[in-house]
Amino acid sequence: MTDSVPPLRRGIDIMRSPIAESPGLILRDPFRYTQAVLLIPPGWIPALAILNGTSTQLDLQTALSRANGGQMVRSEDVQHFVHTLRDQGFLDSEEFYRMRDSRHEQFRQSAARHSTHAGSAYPADAAELTRQLREDFRIVPPTHSLSRKLLGVAAPHVSPFGGVESYASAYQRLAPELGARTFVILGTSHYGAPEKFGLTRKAYSTPLGNAEVDVELMERLATNAPEAVTREDYCHAVEHSIEFQVVFLQQAVRPDVRILPILCGPLWDSLRTGQPPDSHPQVARFIEALAELATVEGDRLFWVLGVDMAHIGARYGDAVAVTANEGRMHDIAARDSARLDRVCAGDTRGFFDLVHPNQDELKWCGYSPIYVFLRTMEHVRPNARGRLLRYDQWNIDAQSVVSFGALEFFDGAVPV
């Protein structure tokens, strides 16, 4: 009871239980080092606040007893609470490090990057998934872009259920004729290191087949920007921002589509300093290397951005609850629109100037991929322009909203 308890791990998801009959806080590991999901009852929540690495089990017992109106909490119950958190990988302890190292080694040894969200975000059965995607694509009229100047599209990475109209609007612009291209997928790395970019050689395996990585291009990029790149980044194993794009690409183009998946870490330094992201030498070198690749490969590449926009409400640390397309979200839509105008104009600096004040209070998690794409296009396709195909907002829970949309990009003026 007198030894210090390891601190609660950073980076775990802590959210209110959505089930009225089971109140409390839910703990979940987005890195999937542990598969456990724990419910912390209301009376035990005060213990989480003092799991700082210096508190003892006696300190926890005292805090819990005080929070429960002076009613003594048994020491064996406190011990069970601590052991459960530790054994399930939620404390910064040796048990967690073993779990983490084991998962990293599993990913390193695996021949492919296997679907993480099949069976939850979308069907795990190939026939059922194909049927679902065909239905999704019928939600919007078929509008394949016949322009040879089409450079790429941007789509959400929110749940396909919540973002289906935007996904369909983006991927309806694609056709099997693009199958010979390599699809450069710039996805948000929700869990990656700041100012870093995650690469992998592993094929993305989904129920529809394997999307092989263009390894030669990946190696060239990694070699030319070694300080900026994390090879075989474990974040690929758990990240959804690229996985969802691969599934839609496989339906829109071909199941064995060839990809160059790039996870873009948060550009925190630019938000902290107010200086453009490529003021950071790692970011600048990566963008230069990507632009060099794009210059050489030219029309052999097609660009896909897996990006969401604003994150507003209680889930994201805001004091008020919000509802999609109501109240405060009208102002958010107007501010999103101003940023999208700069994106479509190819105005990288104008986009950044709207994002960085107040360290991006709209919390656009697509900021990194969008900035990297715009800056790369400035190098190789300075006349590139975009068009907004659809804008949406969705209540990810009863109190919180995510905004997102679909865009297309052209080499030059947008066709009428």
What are these regions (language model features)?
Residues 102-104, 270, 397:
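Short secondary-structure boundary/hinge segments and terminal tails
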Residues 14-16, 257-259, 382-388:
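Generic structural motif
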Residues 19-21, 198, 256, 401-403:
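A short, structural micro-pattern
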Residues 22-24, 162-163, 397:
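Short N-terminal binding/cap micro-motifs at the start of the first secondary-structure element
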Residues 380-416:
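Long, Lys/Arg- and hydrophobic-enriched amphipathic alpha-helices
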Residues 111, 116-375, 379, 392, ...:
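Active-site histidine-anchored catalytic micro-motif
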Residues 1-49:
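Acidic, low-complexity/disordered tracts enriched in E/D and polar residues
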Residues 31-127:
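Long, charge-rich, low-complexity alpha-helical segments
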